[in-house]
């Protein structure tokens, strides 16, 4: 197989969110397969020396906090999977149903807290920052649990459940209302057989900008949509400068994020995967640590004996 070729930022900025790589890059993301190491001692040697650490996180790290992933067997809301509802077409066809789905997800987060994995990442960022070392999190998650745990250097490439975007004026705003609008109160039950609320569009969340009143949508990246070029430029810079990369709780099947860690590995930077199972990318990385992230990450990111702690 051909080695992975670094995908230039001008290409990455044009990529869209999806479950398969764009045709133009499918032949660029293959690496020679090798068995990854599970030696924590060896990983810790790299960790002790790293000055710029990138952590790429996915749904697995939040699943340990009880956040529904809508992936795999049982990953349904009513009779739909996320990819059935998280699309521009679904919103255009039935905005009430899509808003019920996202209202349910927002309300669920009210009872969820960061787990040991989130906390280990945030603590590591704070500790290493005092040593002049950089830790940045690139997350595909939209639940804000990294932020809640205290992570500051955070790139939320798929947006946030708690931001809205007006379909008329384009204004993006934080929104932590519960419920987000009166008509959604008590709606969004996930059980199969639950009937759609069929809320009139004028009663769905509306823009509060003066003179607008347009329909709001969740400020998240839906399947088939382009990712924000500005955020992806930041991602590209972080990947280009990191000297250690961790891939945490991600299935490595959603693009373009699935390309990020292989890009880094292609230039010889050690990459460590932390997951409850192997993924299509496992053999492209130097390390693989199998198990719950809340168990493996605290050990991996703990203060090293060679660190100078102020």
Curated annotation (Swiss-Prot):
One of its GO terms (biological process) is regulation of ketone biosynthetic process. Inhibited by suramin. NAD-dependent lysine desuccinylase activity is inhibited by physiological nicotinamide concentrations, while deacetylase activity is not. In contrast, resveratrol activates deacetylase activity, while inhibiting desuccinylase activity. The active site is at 158 (proton acceptor). Its main location: mitochondrion. Residues 37-307 form the Deacetylase sirtuin-type domain. Coiled coil: none annotated. Residues 1-36 form a transit peptide. Substrate binds at residues 102, 105. GO terms for molecular function: histone deacetylase activity, NAD-dependent; NAD+ binding; NAD-dependent protein lysine deacetylase activity; protein-glutaryllysine deglutarylase activity; protein-malonyllysine demalonylase activity; protein-succinyllysine desuccinylase activity; zinc ion binding. Keywords: Cytoplasm, Metal-binding, Mitochondrion, NAD, Nucleus, Transferase, Transit peptide, Zinc. NAD-dependent lysine demalonylase, desuccinylase and deglutarylase that specifically removes malonyl, succinyl and glutaryl groups on target proteins. Activates CPS1 and contributes to the regulation of blood ammonia levels during prolonged fasting: acts by mediating desuccinylation and deglutarylation of CPS1, thereby increasing CPS1 activity in response to elevated NAD levels during fasting. Activates SOD1 by mediating its desuccinylation, leading to reduced reactive oxygen species. Activates SHMT2 by mediating its desuccinylation. Interacts with CPS1. Interacts with PCCA. Monomer. Homodimer. Forms homodimers upon suramin binding. HAMAP family: Sirtuin_ClassIII. Belongs to the sirtuin family. Class III subfamily. This is NAD-dependent protein deacylase sirtuin-5, mitochondrial. It comes from Homo sapiens.
């Amino acid at each position: 197989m051909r080695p992975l070729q670094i995908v230039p930022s001008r290409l990455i900025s044009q990529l869209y969110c999806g479950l398969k790589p764009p045709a133009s890059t499918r032949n660029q993301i293959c690496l020679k397969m090798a068995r990854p190491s599970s030696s924590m001692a060896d990983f810790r040697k790299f960790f002790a020396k790293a000055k710029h650490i990138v952590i790429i996180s996915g749904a697995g790290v939040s699943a340990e906090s009880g956040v529904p992933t809508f992936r795999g067997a049982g990953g349904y809301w009513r009779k739909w999977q996320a990819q059935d509802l998280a699309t521009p077409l679904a919103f255009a066809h039935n905005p009430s149903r899509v808003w019920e789905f996202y209202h349910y997800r927002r309300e669920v987060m009210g009872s969820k807290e960061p787990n040991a994995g989130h906390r280990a990442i945030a603590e590591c960022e704070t500790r290493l920052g005092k040593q002049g070392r950089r830790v940045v999190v690139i997350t595909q998650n939209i639940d804000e649990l990294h932020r809640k745990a205290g992570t500051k250097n955070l790139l939320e490439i798929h947006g946030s459940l708690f931001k809205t975007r007006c379909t008329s004026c384009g204004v993006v705003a934080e929104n932590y209302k519960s419920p987000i609008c009166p008509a959604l109160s008590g709606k969004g039950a996930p059980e199969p057989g639950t009937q759609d609320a069929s809320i009139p569009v004028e009663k769905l969340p509306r823009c509060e900008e003066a003179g607008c009143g347009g329909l709001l949508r969740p400020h998240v990246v839906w399947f088939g949509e382009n990712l924000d070029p500005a955020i992806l430029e930041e991602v590209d810079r972080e990947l280009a400068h990191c000297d250690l990369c961790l891939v945490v709780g991600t299935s490595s099947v959603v693009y373009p994020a699935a390309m990020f860690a292989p890009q880094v590995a292609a230039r010889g930077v050690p990459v460590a995967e932390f997951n409850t199972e192997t993924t299509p990318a496992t053999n492209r990385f130097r390390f693989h640590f199998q198990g719950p992230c809340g168990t493996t990450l605290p050990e991996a990111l703990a203060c090293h004996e060679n660190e100078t702690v102020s």
